[in-house]
């Protein structure tokens, strides 16, 4: 079935290549390896990096394209999902038609192309969310348990996307002739988790202020001088999502109350193995029965902004307080990508504690499936 559909979209030769590449073994990379490799962005290293991506990206992209064709409950035929599949097939075609990379000019041309591929895939998450939303509207009786298969696919799909974007972004960033201090590509070798948490919290409060007119305070505790190597954009995204959920929960709970809204507390702890960031709120918590659902892509405690009047063209521009229920599961994937994790503990009637664990060691390879 999958091959037939891919044959309809691509030439016979290219469709066979998709199938062939989709069966090949992926090669995982660790944060430490990326750092060691990025220490010297010499022309030789950039050439090796481009040659690796030229071989690796088609394998990863082909796997996802094939999987997008074989989703249960008719999800593969939803217009939004077909659009995403076509982006993946276009990117596969671009990569496979690029000639062997032998010199600096080849490498620069390749870098320009993968940069365009990254932009092409910018809106994959909201467009896939629209496809899921279309399915939920058709099958309103589906419980999240029934959709376990789709949830597992989305975990694999989004984890793969994080990896693809990290590899491309890292390669492109190594070309920067004037990188910011202490940066090796995307990686900040002396990142202050406190500083990133502060910026992310202010961004989350800003959205709350726009939506509600006021926002609870966020207090941050920890050693301001502590730094470790990590990807600041990843950490910002994770803390932003956690704080956004917390400020919304507290704001809605205390909106009509005479009491002052209690602050969100962020604690940064630096252990030997992990850096742990705890985000605590008094927003009323989540019922115990709802806790397993918060890590699924089909559940949100807030109104879902992906209504039927949205199209794949404008869905990505929707910026609301609640998002589309993907922030928590995707944050956990970002944490796990470099060997960390995200746990959430809730006290119904009081509040929620989120524990974001980040590996300090940097030697865990990408979790590829």
Question: What kind of region is each of these model predictions?
Answer:
Residues 315-317, 339-345:
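Glycine-rich ATP-binding loops of the HATPase_c
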Residues 231, 244-282, 306-315, 320:
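ATP-lid-like helix-loop hinge signature
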Residues 301, 359-364:
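Two-component histidine kinase transmitter core
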Residues 274, 285, 325, 347-355, ...:
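Glycine-rich nucleotide-binding loop
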